[in-house]
Amino acid sequence: MPARARILLMSALSGLLWALAWPAIGGFAWLAFVAWLPMLHAERLHELRTKEGKRAFFPYALLGLFLWNALTTYWFFLVSEPMTTKLVSVGVPVVGNTLLMGIPWWLRRLAKRSLGGRWADAALVVLWLAGERLHHSWDLQWPWLSLGNVFGTQPAWVQWYEFTGMLGGTLWVLVTNLAINAVIATWGSSRQRSLRMGALALAVLGLPLIA
């Protein structure tokens, strides 16, 4: 399979996993802990394909984000209105939210080029949290796809939301995905670091479940 096709496939898989994880769509909340891994792998494939990674990854990221938005917001199309209204009702939020979700991934790439991978991971976490916070406070708020909402069918997992709010779940999901990704990315080159990151991933995943 051509490299570009593999990148597109990985990005699309990420969007599909998020849809399957989402309440009222798939409901497999545990998939949230691995749903970003195909997207992060797509980024690695993109860097290998473009050598120095200078070509934009943004369009590839948008594919997965668009699928996630479309598969979880399709019900806007079910309104009892003319077809034009149906298309606008689903198209505007899906496209708009896809672009907003793409901004943290775009800025992550900029951070990775100038500061390195660790800072890029930190940038993604901070920027995504900031984006979700914005979505809860401005006039165009659309909190439906905030990552922390994925545990809506598993309240026993997130009793601590009373202290952290939904953003605590978002942080949990992001850090777990990034920690697992670090294990995968370093497994062949630095086994010791991979083991350390594996221990971190288990701690990040497990501690909130027993809190």
Predicted features and spans:
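Membrane-embedded alpha-helical bundles of multi-pass enzymes
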Residues: 1-211
